[in-house]
């Protein structure tokens, strides 16, 4: 009985902790949205447009009042919208921890550093690829789409075909990686990418040092737990399998290989960028495939397993 009582107490404490965290995250989400609305209302000179762009940016949803997305607004307003997307692609738990650790703790966060580094590095790479190929999109477009793809926001300043084929491949990778765990961004998530990089690093070092070498599996100085590793590997396998299957379906319907890969990666990463294939006239089968990818990309593997495995329903 004592043991059962302890379990009940632990469960109650855990539930209360989840409730407290949820309230804090909700309050932070509302606060970020209100600040974003105020900033964008001034930038646009229109409170309604500011609100619509703020809601889409904080949610990294990418919906815009204008059919031109960010193409029809000023450079300053577009930069502010993308900046808000970056803020929302960072874990909300990290923003909450900043109250205790200060800005130094935020700057030291490895996921934040990786997010900013990927946006800057990919933007520069795409710009160089544009210059090399002579394609239509400029430097500003390269960085704007890099941020939009990495945060899975889906805002655009030019059509996707304005980028060279290698540039589109870079955007595909970014959409699949996505933002931070605990943020509004989709994708595989940065922390899981760091886990896989740590695994590859250990494998490489073990080859160099010999099979008897004892090499700890660590991420940012902290040991990677078995469950964390299994989570990352399992999700990577599921995402790769789903992406390949969906891509083959698109190819069977006559869609060009790169465009098919772009559309399926965008759906799986819940990014919303398009290569021009998706529209009102899209075949119902392809619409269903993209819908399934977006659902899988948003709820992720373990929520799907809970849904499809009856044994988990009673737990």
Show where each model-derived region lies.
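Membrane-proximal intracellular helices of multi-pass ion channels
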Residues: 1-315
């Amino acid at each position: 009985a004592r043991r059962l009582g302890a379990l009940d107490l632990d469960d109650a404490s855990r539930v209360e902790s989840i409730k407290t965290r949820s309230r804090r995250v909700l309050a932070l989400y509302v606060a970020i949205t209100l600040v974003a609305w105020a900033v964008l209302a001034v930038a646009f000179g229109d409170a309604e447009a500011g609100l619509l762009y703020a809601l889409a940016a904080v949610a990294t949803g990418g919906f815009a009042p204008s059919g031109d997305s960010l193409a029809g607004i000023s450079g300053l307003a577009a930069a502010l919208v993308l900046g808000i997307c970056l803020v929302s692609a960072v874990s909300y738990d990290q923003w909450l921890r900043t109250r205790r650790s200060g800005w130094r703790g935020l700057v030291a966060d490895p996921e934040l550093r990786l997010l900013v580094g990927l946006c800057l590095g990919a933007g520069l790479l795409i710009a160089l690829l544009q210059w090399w190929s002579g394609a239509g999109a400029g430097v500003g477009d390269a960085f704007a789409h890099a941020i939009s793809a990495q945060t899975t926001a889906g805002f655009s300043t030019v059509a996707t075909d304005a980028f060279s084929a290698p540039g589109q491949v870079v955007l595909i990778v970014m959409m699949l990686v996505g933002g931070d765990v605990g943020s509004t961004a989709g994708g595989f998530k940065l922390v899981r990418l760091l886990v896989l990089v740590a695994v590859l690093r250990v494998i490489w070092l073990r080859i160099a040092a010999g099979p008897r070498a004892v090499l700890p599996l660590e991420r940012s100085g902290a040991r990677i737990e078995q469950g964390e590793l299994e989570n990352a590997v399992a999700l990577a396998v599921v995402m790769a399998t789903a992406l390949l299957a969906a891509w083959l379906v698109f190819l069977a319907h006559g869609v060009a290989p790169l465009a098919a890969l772009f559309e399926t990666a965008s759906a799986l990463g819940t990014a919303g960028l398009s290569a021009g294939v998706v529209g009102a006239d899209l075949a119902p089968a392809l619409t269903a495939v993209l819908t399934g990818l977006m659902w899988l990309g948003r709820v992720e593997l373990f929520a799907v397993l809970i849904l499809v495995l009856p044994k988990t329903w009673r737990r």
